[in-house]
Amino acid sequence: MTLLPTNAATGPGAARAPELPEARGEVSQALRSRLLGAGSGQLPGPAEIARCSPYGEDLHLALHLCYELHYRGFSGVPDTLEWDHRLLEARALLEHRFESALRHDCTPLPDVGEALDALLVEPADGTGVSDFLMSRGESWHLREYAALRSVHQLREADPHLWVVPRLLGRAKAAMVAIEYDEYGCGRPERMHSRLYAELMAALDLDPSYGRYTEAAGAELLAASNLMSFFGLHRRLRGALVGHFAVLETTSPPAASRIAAATRRTGAGPAAERYYDEHVEADAVHEQLVRREVVGGLLEDEPALAPEVAFGIAATCFLEDRLGSRVVDAWARGESALRTPLSHAAAP
């Protein structure tokens, strides 16, 4: 078992920034060089970004580099670059490419209530990641999935906090109440990000923030980037609420299945505790999100209904892409990571 270091999620070294990941194409290379103060400093323009796949490795690592400046930053990168106008211009081009593809490829249900109801319907085929882990997952599958999700789970609730100053009344009060739970109800040892770090340590993974970004493919980065994209733009507050509703609604059944997998594989109490917590807490949150957060927002700003529906559709679209990528690799007996985990049982 890995000992939980003091820089994992909380503790004296918690603010230590991660290392810059390696580039995955010309666009991310240009941004990486800018962050390091190397090279010509020339950043990609519309023509270069138009050549990127909107869901590909290069674009989503580039977006990840931009967004992480608003969280922990990177080792060796000046904090002043968070608001560097040239980086912000490049980020806007990347976001436009990403958003345009999502709005083309996603088909939101016209009624938000119908969209929320659809989230409660479990797929009959049971082919998702949590189904795989529950029915036939091995320890190495659990480790890979924990490493993948750590890219955003070690800051679990942070992106959704950006919506709080943009909400009013019922929606704001309910959102803060739910986030209070996410942050441990005032107890740092109960913060969900801390519980996730303890889960990682129990699975013999390094729980340092950003440790497994190199191993995460474009599908995971796109799902992670989506919440930052929604969170950083006030015009997308409805979409961020839709994103939040998906996570809180779909979490309990998936967490229940993964909790069963942790018990079957003997992952240990810390691994079980994280998923058990989400079975209990998110079951309560689901109704609060629907009635008060979504309901309150649409009472105050009914014109945002299409954006809430878009947020739901975009989140499901990217999560489905991620799930298919992971399960397809595992079904072939292969790793779902870009780089293998050290000390992992060989697939």
Residue positions per predicted region:
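Non-heme di-metal
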Residues: T2-P347
